[in-house]
Amino acid sequence: MTESFDIWMRSVQSCLEKKLSELLPSENRTPQRLHEAMRYAVLDGGKRIRPLLVFATGTLFGAKTSVMAQVASAVEMIHAYSLIHDDMPCMDNDVLRRGKPTVHVQFGEAMALLAGDALQAQAFVVLSNVNDDAVLAVKRYQILSGAAGSLGMCGGQAIDLDSIGKQLTIGQLEQMHRLKTGALLKASVMLGALSAKIPSPEENRALEEYAKAAGLAFQVID
């Protein structure tokens, strides 16, 4: 089972790496340094946990590989943008990410800020180019934008920043992690299903329960 999972995981990661390279602007296209920073942030690193969740649930619902690859790429761009901004001196002030200098160290703070902004925008360009049902497209937009906003990743990061020097309760800590990390993990699960169809109420409840458990497991391991 472990071996078959590893094979599947490597297959998805390889597929996604190619798709991301294709969907990101070329380094040779003006503004070159911005595009270089975007590609630096996204390519050749990371476990691709969120795209794997898109593919796992999407496969269960019979989604096309081409649609899952597009949706998963949008999710990974949102994740990469959040890491760029989180690493900056005004946030967590990290100098290393995935064993290499963070984007603001490599390209400067201003270019890092722009690269993050551009990746967030590019994610929705990618999502808009999925050529299928219009209702599904709107649902996917709602899910991904909600996970990235003030009731998702941004909200979780705001709570994290506000908590510096304070003792958080278990409830506050859970809320921070649920928003900062769990929101995009949950979105990845839901977007996998929405790569194929709109889930039934029963399927929706099951997916949400699974996403909640997966998010908690991720936090424990992380």
Which residues does each PLM region occupy?
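Mg2+-dependent prenyl diphosphate-binding active-site environment of isoprenoid biosynthetic enzymes
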Residues: S14-C15, L24-I221
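N-terminal amphipathic/basic leader segments beginning at the initiator methionine
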Residues: M1-L24
